[in-house]
């Protein structure tokens, strides 16, 4: 009888330890997930910035990687990638380097086409068109004989100029993950076609699918903040071996490098 009571007590003790351990792990996971979401929320607060000139006066996260005299450079990038079934993959996007020291901005409009040769090897062909930004206007710095392409470049808008994540804190049922070895972290949310940002993308791009996208937020570096690492977002409409349709975007604040182009 005594042996039976001891055995029962031992089993209860083991179960209690497992339960407490599980609660501790769950609490840590929930706390980290909340920290990851808050980290992304701070990153997304830069959306909406309609006037690109505002970045000259916008301060970003600074750490020991910055020289005290360096005001930093904002790097903004938007790209639409479309690969219909049976066709080549094509991406069209732009990158700008907004230097807060010199208050000048330069970058490139980039068109990339990925083809597959007869042996099944992928080939990438990329064309860059240098640009500058003045008074919130994109200006090609070299002659462009193709009027349609020139107009596309001059009328280009970055996602940060029309995207808005004011309701991000209300996003539910996200798939949040963390890899401490890199470190890297991510969050995924299934959107619907009534989402404001999805509507804005469909308004500006010919997206050949009615499928609603998944929003993927990806980051690397210290969760508490670091100029080393990256954060970017992606709206994935279709992703498989035959067809890919997605929009990617990033806004980063980095130490200035005068040779960026």
Curated annotation (Swiss-Prot):
Q: Which residues form the signal peptide?
A: 1-22
Instruction: Say if the entry is tagged with keyword Kinase.
Output: no
Residues anchoring lipid (S-diacylglycerol cysteine): 23
Q: Give the UniProt entry's GO cellular component terms.
A: plasma membrane
Q: Where is the lipid attached (N-palmitoyl cysteine)?
A: 23
Instruction: Give the record's keywords alphabetically.
Output: Cell membrane, Lipoprotein, Membrane, Palmitate, Signal
**Membrane topology listed for this record:** Lipid-anchor
Localisation per UniProt entry: Cell membrane
Can the keyword Translocase be found in this entry's annotation?
A: no
**Family label:** Belongs to the staphylococcal tandem lipoprotein family.
Q: What is this protein called?
A: Uncharacterized lipoprotein SAOUHSC_02788
Q: Which species does the entry assign this protein to?
A: Staphylococcus aureus (strain NCTC 8325 / PS 47)
């Amino acid at each position: 009888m005594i042996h039976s009571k001891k055995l029962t007590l031992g089993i209860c003790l083991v179960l209690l330890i497992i339960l407490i351990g599980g609660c501790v792990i769950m609490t840590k996971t929930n706390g980290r997930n909340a920290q990851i979401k808050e980290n992304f929320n701070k990153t997304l607060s830069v959306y909406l910035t309609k006037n690109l000139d505002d970045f000259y006066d916008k301060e970003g996260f600074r750490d020991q990687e910055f020289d005290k005299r360096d005001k930093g450079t904002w790097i903004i990038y938007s790209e639409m990638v479309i690969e219909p079934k049976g066709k080549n993959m094509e991406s069209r996007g732009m990158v700008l380097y907004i230097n807060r020291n010199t208050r000048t901005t330069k970058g490139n409009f980039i068109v990339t086409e990925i083809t597959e040769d007869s042996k099944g090897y992928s080939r990438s062909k990329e064309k860059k068109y240098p640009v500058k930004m003045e008074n919130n206007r994109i200006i090609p710095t070299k002659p462009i004989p193709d009027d349609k392409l020139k107009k596309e470049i001059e009328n280009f808008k970055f996602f940060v100029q029309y995207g808005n994540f004011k309701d991000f804190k209300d996003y539910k049922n996200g798939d949040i993950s963390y890899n401490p070895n890199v470190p890297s972290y991510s969050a995924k949310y299934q959107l619907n076609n009534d989402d404001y940002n999805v509507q804005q993308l469909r308004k500006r791009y010919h997206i050949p699918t009615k499928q609603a996208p998944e929003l993927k937020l990806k980051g690397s570096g210290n969760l508490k903040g670091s100029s080393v690492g990256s954060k970017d977002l992606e709206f994935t409409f279709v992703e498989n071996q035959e067809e890919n349709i997605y929009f990617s975007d990033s806004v980063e604040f980095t130490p200035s490098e005068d040779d960026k182009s």
